[in-house]
Amino acid sequence: MRLALSVAVLALGQPALALAQSRPPSEVPDGWTMQLGGALIAGPAWQGSDDTAASLFPDVRVSYGDRFFASIPEGVGYNLVSSDAWRAGPIAKIRFGRDEEDGGSPFRISGESDELRGLGDIDAAGEVGVFVERRFGEGAAWRLRGEVRQGFGGHEGVLADASLTYQTRLGATLVSMGPRVSLASEDYMQTYFGIDPAQSAGAGLAVYSADGGLLSYGLGASVILPVSRNSAVTVFGSVERLGDAAADSPLIRERGSETQATIGIGYGFRFGL
């Protein structure tokens, strides 16, 4: 999971890494704040892999009031609309590349995969687009969020993500859970799951032309345990299934898995600037 810190998002799409933004804009401190931390994650070596790799991800976040935000997991964005019920604006992310030798996370500390050999490397990609978020229910406990992004560089596809998250407090502990789904265009699917004749000859897999459509769907959950007023430990996990266009690729059928599970633990400390 990719690196210009100013436009960063995890390659495998690890939304559970983020410490939940549980407070409405009216309760967010004015001015600049920063959060520093990290997370140890065990998950697929690459999207669709059945090999497990452990990675140590830095978690660096900068925000200005309830408007500007920048972090490795969530990218860089600006809330053009910001109220207790709605948030919306532009967003930019980066998707880390894929290395045919080992899977390619730049933060990998153990575990690797050699199942990509012969397919070639995929460069890092930038993704720019828009997001809309609606909070509702008692105490704004429910959050419905959607994003649409256009890729450039490593892939030139279009992605659309949607998630529904429920948050509740158990004493000082914040628990979040909910489903999510991702759609991708043919360009994206072909880049990561398609196999052209040259790749077929190099990797020993059948030629495959991937269609656009459902990329993945699944469930995620996180538990945030406050350590102090400005720091917390987060335990998180997710289980996802690849959609048919990805799962039907010979790469996944013969060398990967359509079920993708991730677990991790992180720590973050927030302070004003």
Cite the ranges covered by each PLM segment:
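Cleavable N-terminal export/targeting peptides
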Residues: 1-30, 272-273
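Soluble periplasmic/extracytoplasmic beta-strand elements of cell-envelope proteins
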Residues: 35-39, 89-91, 262-266
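Transmembrane beta-barrel architecture of outer-membrane proteins
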Residues: 33, 55-57, 125-129, 157-161, ...
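Outer-membrane beta-barrel "beta-signal"
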Residues: 57-61, 164, 258-273
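Structural signature of outer-membrane beta-barrel channels/translocons
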Residues: 63-65, 79-81, 133-137, 167-169, ...
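Outer-membrane pore/translocation modules
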Residues: 26, 72-178, 186-211, 238, ...
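Short glycine/proline- and aromatic-enriched beta-strand/turn motifs that initiate or cap beta-hairpins
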Residues: 19-74, 98
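Transmembrane beta-strand segments of outer-membrane beta-barrel domains in Gram-negative
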Residues: 35, 41-47, 113, 211-253
